Swiss-Prot record:
GO biological process: DNA replication; DNA synthesis involved in DNA repair; double-strand break repair; SOS response
Protein name: DNA replication and repair protein RecF
Pfam families: SMC_N
NCBIfam families reported in the protein's UniProt record: recf (TIGR00611)
Molecular-function GO terms, alphabetical: ATP binding; single-stranded DNA binding
Positions of ATP binding: 30-37
Function: The RecF protein is involved in DNA metabolism; it is required for DNA replication and normal SOS inducibility. RecF binds preferentially to single-stranded, linear DNA. It also seems to bind ATP.
Similarity comment: family membership: Belongs to the RecF family.
Subcellular location: Cytoplasm
Gene field: recF
Provenance organism: Geobacillus sp. (strain WCH70)
Signal peptide segment: none
PANTHER family, alphabetized: DNA REPLICATION AND REPAIR PROTEIN RECF
Keywords, ordered alphabetically: ATP-binding, Cytoplasm, DNA damage, DNA repair, DNA replication, DNA-binding, Nucleotide-binding, SOS response
Taxonomy, superkingdom: Bacteria
C-alpha cells in the first residue's frame, strides 16, 4: 500500500499543508523542531487514530484552534482508500471512503503502519507497559475485534479497581458486585491473552531469522510471552478462562487488601532473549538495537502475511541510531517493496543509492516544500 496524499489542518505546528508522496522512499529533510516528527506522527495518527507520542489528544491541536484535521489518500492492492480524522477537544470523528465510522475500532486497520523511532529502543529496555502497548497497537492493525475487546476490558478493569478500593476502605462490604465484575472481566482477559500469545508466536517466527541474519549468524533471538496465567502451545480459550477463574479466586482477599486488580493482561510482559540471555538485563546496546530492528522488520512481514499488502514504514530520525551495517540491512530489506518515510537533519548519512531513488522534501517552520531536485 502507498500513501499518495496527505493534508493537515491545525495539526501541531502545521496551519494548512497538502503534500503528494512518492511510492518508494520519501525523505523529509529539516532542522530540529521544524515539524518533521510532527508530520510522521500525523501519518501514524491517520492510520492508528492515536499518537505514539502523547495520550492527550489536545496536544495534537494547533495552539488557539478548536480542532485538527488529517486527510489522506492511499492506494491498496484492492483499490483506492480515502481517510479523514478530525480531532477536537470533545473527541475524534473518523471517515473511511467518506463514510463516518461509528467506532474507532472500525476505522483502525485500513491503513497499516510500522513506526521505527529512537524511542522504539525502549521496546527492549523499557517498562512492561511499553511492550504491552506495542503488542496492542500491532494486533489492533489486523484485528478490529481485539481493539473492541481491549477497550471493554479497560472499562471493566477501571470499574473493578474502583470497587476494590471501596472494599479496601470499608466504604463497601458486599462482595457480590466484585464477583459480577470478575465474571465479566475473565472472558475478555482470556481472549486478549490468547490473541497476544498467537501474535507473539508469529512475531517470533518472522523475527528470529531476521535477527540471525543481521547478527551475521552469531545470535538466536527468542520472544517469550509472560502473562498472568500459564499458557502453552496447545492452549485454548476455555483453558485460559479456567486458569483466570482459579487465579482470581486465589488472589481475591489480597486484591481487596491492596485495592487493585492483581492479575490480567494489564500486568503482562514480554521478554526478549539472545542466545538464552535476557537482552534487557544482559544485552549490549548493539544487541538491543539489533533486537528492536529485527522486531520492526518482522512486523512488516507479519502484516504482509496477514493482509497480503505491505504496510507503510516510518523511520523517524532512526537511521542515525544504527551503524552502517544495520542501516544497510534495513534499507536493502525494504527497498522497492515498502513505501518508506525517512526524517533526517542531513542526507549525508543515507546511502547514495537510496537518495537517487527518493523524493526529498524540505520542512521549515511547519511548511513543506515540493520534492527537491538533486
Amino acid at each position: 500500500m502507498f500513501l499518495t496524499h496527505l493534508s493537515l489542518k491545525n495539526y501541531r505546528n502545521y496551519e494548512s499543508e497538502t503534500i503528494e508522496f512518492a511510492n518508494n522512499v520519501n525523505i523529509i529533510l529539516g532542522e530540529n523542531a521544524q515539524g518533521k516528527t510532527n508530520m510522521m506522527e500525523a501519518i501514524y495518527v491517520l492510520a492508528m487514530a492515536k499518537s505514539h507520542r502523547t495520550t492527550n489528544d489536545k496536544d495534537l491541536i494547533r495552539w488557539d484552534e478548536d480542532y485538527a484535521k488529517i486527510e489522506g489518500k492511499a492506494m491498496k492492492k484492492n483499490g483506492a482508500l480515502s481517510l479523514e480524522l478530525i480531532i477536537s477537544k470533545k473527541g475524534k470523528k473518523a471517515k473511511c471512503n467518506h463514510i463516518e465510522q461509528q467506532r474507532l475500532s472500525q476505522y483502525v486497520g485500513h491503513l497499516n503502519i510500522v513506526m521505527f523511532a529512537p524511542e522504539d529502543l525502549n521496546l527492549v529496555k523499557g517498562s512492561p507497559q511499553v511492550r504491552r502497548r506495542f503488542v496492542d497497537m500491532e494486533i489492533g492493525q489486523v484485528s478490529p475485534v481485539y481493539i473492541h475487546d481491549l477497550s471493554q476490558y479497560q472499562k471493566l478493569l477501571q470499574q473493578r479497581n474502583h470497587y476494590l478500593k471501596m472494599l479496601q476502605t470499608r466504604e463497601q462490604q458486599d462482595e457480590t458486585v466484585l464477583d459480577i465484575l470478575t465474571e465479566q472481566l475473565i472472558p475478555l482477559a482470556a481472549k486478549i491473552t490468547l490473541k497476544r500469545y498467537e501474535f507473539l508466536l508469529l512475531l517470533q517466527k518472522w523475527a528470529a531469522p531476521i535477527h540471525h541474519e543481521i547478527s551475521r549468524g552469531l545470535e538466536t533471538l527468542q520472544i517469550q510471552y509472560r502473562p498472568s496465567v500459564d499458557v502453552s502451545e496447545k492452549i485454548e480459550l476455555s483453558r485460559i478462562i479456567e486458569a483466570y477463574s482459579e487465579k482470581f479466586a486465589t488472589i481475591k482477599e489480597r486484591e481487596i487488601q491492596r485495592g487493585m486488580t492483581l492479575a490480567g493482561p494489564h500486568r503482562d510482559d514480554i521478554a526478549f532473549s539472545v542466545n538464552g540471555k535476557d537482552v534487557q538485563i544482559f544485552g549490549s546496546q548493539g544487541q538491543q538495537r539489533t533486537t528492536a530492528l529485527s522486531i520492526k522488520l518482522a512486523e512488516i512481514e507479519l502484516i504482509f502475511s496477514e493482509i497480503g499488502d505491505y504496510p507503510i514504514l516510518l523511520l523517524d530520525d532512526v537511521l542515525s541510531e544504527l551503524d552502517d551495517f544495520r542501516q544497510t540491512h534495513l534499507l536493502d530489506t525494504i527497498r522497492k517493496k515498502v513505501q518508506t518515510f525517512v526524517t533526517t537533519t542531513s542526507i549525508e548519512g543515507i546511502e547514495h543509492d537510496i537518495i537517487k531513488e527518493a523524493a526529498i522534501y524540505k520542512v521549515h517552520s511547519g511548511h513543506i516544500t515540493a520534492p527537491l531536485c538533486d
